[in-house]
Curated annotation (Swiss-Prot):
GO terms for biological process: translation. This is Large ribosomal subunit protein uL3. The lineage of its organism: Bacteria, Pseudomonadati, Pseudomonadota, Gammaproteobacteria, Alteromonadales. One of its GO terms (cellular component) is cytosolic large ribosomal subunit. Part of the 50S ribosomal subunit. Forms a cluster with proteins L14 and L19. Pfam families: Ribosomal_L3. Disulfide bonds: none annotated.
Length: 212
């Protein structure tokens, strides 16, 4: 089954192999994903599962959300996510079903999607790895400036897409082909090798790797 799940980044640690080799791992808490809606070709034009996870205070739920959760008969969660299904996937899954981390028991590699840490407004050196200019030799103001961006008469303008200073981070990022180190069904934990996007407690979408 190639269905993805929603998880929460707990943090990083390391585990040791039988040979004593240290492996850096990210701990992802994958609590039960409750199915709130099943989208089909007949009704929606495509196949997908809408899921929620976690909990949310009753006074923080909007009336449309409350009606949607009541209709599906599922406890309100901290958000709603949609997971697309390919042909033949998700057969037999109905509204109210709960998916857990056990579906990754036979998966070797996963793709993890999250929102990267926001860095605010940053210059070209930090944002795009530009080289700095001379610290001396007559340069007193432009050590970290972007340099020439539009030339003179030719082309006499700044090309679209030019790498410049601006807002950095807080983007949807996917890290591909992360090794699954351990699946702990009892504690709803998934351990993957290496780092994943985002800050601690951030929501993540975990799917079997498309390039595995």
């Amino acid at each position: 089954m190639a269905i993805g799940l929603i998880g929460r980044k707990v943090g990083m640690t390391r585990i040791f192999t039988e040979d004593g080799v240290s492996i850096p791992v990210t701990v992802i808490e994958v609590a039960g994903n409750r199915v709130t809606q099943v989208k089909t070709l007949e009704t929606d034009g495509y196949r997908a599962l809408q899921v929620t996870t976690g909990t949310k205070k009753a006074n923080r739920i909007t009336k449309p959300e409350a009606g949607h959760f009541a209709k599906s008969g599922v406890e309100a969660g901290r958000g709603l996510w949609e997971l697309r299904l390919a042909d033949g996937e998700g057969e037999g899954i109905e509204v109210g079903a709960e998916l857990n981390v056990g579906i990754f028991a036979d998966v070797a590699k996963v793709d993890v999607t999250g929102q990267s840490k926001g860095k605010g407004f940053q210059g070209g050196v930090k944002r795009w790895n530009f080289r700095t200019q001379d610290m001396t030799h007559g340069n007193s103001l432009s050590h970290r400036s972007n340099g020439s961006i539009g030339q003179n008469q030719t082309p006499g303008r700044v090309f679209k897409g030019k790498k410049m200073s601006g807002h950095m981070g807080a983007e949807r990022v996917t890290t591909q082909n992360l090794d699954v180190v351990r699946v702990d069904v009892e504690r709803n934990l998934l351990l993957v090798k290496g780092a994943v996007p985002g800050a601690t407690n951030g929501d993540l979408i975990i799917k079997p790797a498309v390039k595995a």
